[in-house]
């Protein structure tokens, strides 16, 4: 980045990060990569999050990076859930030559990226949709409105649909309540439900 070779920077990031524009915006870099940066011992760590965000945005606006994909190996993998874990898993497997299908219970893929994180932190159409398209460009298929345990089961995916393995990335959808009086009253929402309602109803 310092040398101005943003394409090379994007290629380096793409080797290990499937969702760089998202990670650069919402990951807690201060406790993860930046928290481990040796420069932070005596000064400020490298602003890894901001650099990743910049490079990812530049890459998206300039044609993107085409990761190297191994030849098809003939194995099908099912991924349950299209949140960040499911998308990252599907992306990595597709690069290794697997035929990957994501099964998403809701009507749009993305999980917490789509329904949980507010628009001002993570633009849905500009960033999330573009990152999902980059995963699909690797050959990953996404089926929405498919509820694991009802529409399909793990057994049916393995025994009837011909999948060699199933990755379950269903997310942390159920909140943990505090057990205080009145928490079950009408109009009292968990953080998850509040954020989902906000995103679905476009309250912003």
Which stretches of residues belong to each language-model region?
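Residue-level detector of alpha-helix initiation sites
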Residues: 18, 83-85, 108
């Amino acid at each position: 980045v310092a040398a101005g070779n943003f394409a090379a920077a994007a290629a380096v990031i793409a080797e290990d990060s499937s969702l760089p524009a998202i990670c650069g915006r919402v990951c807690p870099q201060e406790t993860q990569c930046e928290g481990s940066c040796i420069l932070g011992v005596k000064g400020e760590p490298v602003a890894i999050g901001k650099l990743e965000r910049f490079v990812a945005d530049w890459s998206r606006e300039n044609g993107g990076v085409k990761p190297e994909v191994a030849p098809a190996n003939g194995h099908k993998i099912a991924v349950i859930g299209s949140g960040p874990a499911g998308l990252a898993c599907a992306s990595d497997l597709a690069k290794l030559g697997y035929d990957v299908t994501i099964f998403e219970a809701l009507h749009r893929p993305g999980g917490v990226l789509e329904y949980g994180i507010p628009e001002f932190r993570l633009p849905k159409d500009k960033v999330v949709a573009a990152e999902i398209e980059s995963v699909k460009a690797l050959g990953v298929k996404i089926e929405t409105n498919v509820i694991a345990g009802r529409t399909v089961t793990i057994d049916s995916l393995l025994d009837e649909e011909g999948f060699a393995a199933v990755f379950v990335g269903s997310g942390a959808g159920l909140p943990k309540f505090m057990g205080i009086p009145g928490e079950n009253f009408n109009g009292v929402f968990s953080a998850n439900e509040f954020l989902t309602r906000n995103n679905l109803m476009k309250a912003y």
